Amino acid sequence: MSQLLTARQAEELHKAMIAYLLSANLPKSAAALREELADSVQLDDSTAKKYEGLLEKKWTSVVRLQKKIMDLESRNNALQSELDSATPTSLARRNQDPVSWLPHAPARHILQSHREPVTCVGFHPVFSSLASGSDDTTIKIWDWELGELERTIKGHTKAVLDVDYGGPRGGTLLASCSSDLTIKLWDPSDGYKNIRTLPGHDHSVSAVRFIPSGAAGSPLSGNLLVSASRDKTLRIWDVTTGYCVKTLRGHVDWVRDVVASPDGRFLFSAGNDQVARLWDVSSGETKSTFLGHEHAVECVAFAPPTSYPHLAALAGLKKAPPSSSSAEYVATGSRDKSIRIWDARGTLIKTLIGHDNWVRALAFHPGGKYLLSVSDDKTLRCWDLTQECKCVRTVKDAHGHFISCIRWAPNIIKDAGVVNGDDTSTAASANGGALGASAINGVVPTGKKEDPGGGPMMGIRCVIATGSVDLKVRVFAS
């Protein structure tokens, strides 16, 4: 008898082995084992039924435990490597200062439910809800804190290409766009009911973004939405009426991406024509064009005011633009594998080289010091704007396939009652009169009474999400 097992354990194992052989239709082998064990195991047919499947369960349990051990060892090695390369001073500073936080492996959560590639992700401005869209035509709503799927939204008939939360104050909506040529608006406060469908584009709608309130003093402030399409146009919509209020023309090929400036005054777009354009929302005119990429431009981003001092220094300026100004610096990512940083006039400041495949999405760190990028090379890269845009961290194999998107959770403004244009008092009343823990999880105060622009103190949520052709969404969080 094995010294590793007690007599009782050995008997249970033998019964499970015989039951397995019988269930596998191997009666001769089962009989041979019974004969070999002689009288040490009493197992009639009725008792054998109780042991069916037991061996398989134990086997799969062992496999799961082995996988858990390997995952924990991998996580431990990654953390140990990070610890070994850090000094006590840098560790203390990182623990205290969210401005220096960067994502690292392993991800906090791996969210799996989509049946085809994940194309887009978007964070709710207040609560711990994360939306993801996919080629499988669905939108899925996750709780990124718990790593759980909350619901699946169906309505589009082709691939969902982008999602974004925003809208009027106190009335956050989710917008989605699709290859089915439509944009749809969903109400999170009413079970994500589809409240409006916006037709009008003549081809796939590639990107959709809410325009923050205060767009050039427009009476429609807070109600505007912009979309980009393969039909070569941008369209601005009034979400309360569903009407297209403006069509912007200038691109001569598929418009891949569009974003709005933080104050809603400007739009930045780019596409297959290898050109990026800065637009004035109120006039609908192109303010600047950005030329230099050698392939389609996949993604664009506005630099936050917190990055102005670093980018001004990079541009050789002695004084940074005021943080109250809008759209001073922008970034573009391209299929030519490069990232380019520009000023608002279209002057190239810096070209970032390092990715080995198409650059698919960009996100500036809200603290202003870093730019994050993801690529078809399966990596997530962090570029330090204070070190000549040096790549200071690479999360290798962040996904198992091409990475299609990245979003940083929006900041929470601590004392203004407004969260990125959303009235938190409404959200609080819907949650029993006060913001629950999930509404503020992941928030780390900056430690400053005011932001650089003189506004209210903001809390940086050290949370990002990425999506991939590997069908998964990954959440990286502090």
UniProtKB/Swiss-Prot annotation:
SUPFAM superfamilies: Lissencephaly-1 protein (Lis-1, PAF-AH alpha) N-terminal domain, WD40 repeat-like. GO terms for molecular function: dynein complex binding. CDD domains: WD40. GO terms for cellular component: cytoplasm; microtubule; microtubule associated complex; spindle pole; transferase complex. Residues 9-41 form the LisH domain. Positively regulates the activity of the minus-end directed microtubule motor protein dynein. May enhance dynein-mediated microtubule sliding by targeting dynein to the microtubule plus end. Required for nuclear migration during vegetative growth as well as development. Required for retrograde early endosome (EE) transport from the hyphal tip. Required for localization of dynein to the mitotic spindle poles. Recruits additional proteins to the dynein complex at SPBs. Self-associates. Interacts with NDL1 and dynein. Dimerization mediated by the LisH domain may be required to activate dynein. This is Nuclear distribution protein PAC1. The lineage of its organism: Eukaryota, Fungi, Dikarya, Ascomycota, Pezizomycotina.
